[in-house]
């Protein structure tokens, strides 16, 4: 794949096999360019930069697709891996759950039943 930069938009439509093949091609090309750089003058330094960025684009697409598949897999499961859960602050993670908030002690329940809030009528 010695033609220009890789466009990320084109990568999304490719299958996993195509992406891994392209990644292997880019890595071999990068290796060849590094050998050329050592052997002769550094005329292809810009090309090395482009190839490295292209490798990063391909890896980004592969990882994003993989994470999307994992999200689908864990969608209706009780537990999901920490990195797939919605990001929350530490304080929010330590908050009481709605179930824990709604719990009332037996003694408190009895008090509210036996001694309800008094209603006063104001004489006008």
Curated annotation (Swiss-Prot):
Q: Which Pfam families match?
A: Ribosomal_L29 (PF00831)
Q: Which GO terms describe its molecular function?
A: mRNA binding; structural constituent of ribosome
InterPro entries named in the record? Ribosomal_uL29, Ribosomal_uL29_euk, Ribosomal_uL29_sf
Taxonomically, the superkingdom here is Eukaryota
The GO cellular component terms are: cytosolic large ribosomal subunit
Q: Which SUPFAM superfamilies does its entry note?
A: Ribosomal protein L29 (L29p)
Q: Which Gene3D superfamilies match?
A: 1.10.287.310, 6.10.250.3450
Q: Which UniProt keywords apply?
A: Ribonucleoprotein, Ribosomal protein
CDD domains, per this entry? Ribosomal_L29_HIP
Sorted alphabetically, the Gene Ontology BP terms of this entry are:
maturation of LSU-rRNA from tricistronic rRNA transcript (SSU-rRNA, 5.8S rRNA, LSU-rRNA); translation
**Is Cytoplasm tagged as a keyword?**
no
In which family does this protein belong, per the annotation?
A: Belongs to the universal ribosomal protein uL29 family.
HAMAP family in alphabetical order: Ribosomal_uL29
**Which protein, by its recorded name, is this?**
Large ribosomal subunit protein uL29
- Look up and give the organism this protein is from: Triticum aestivum
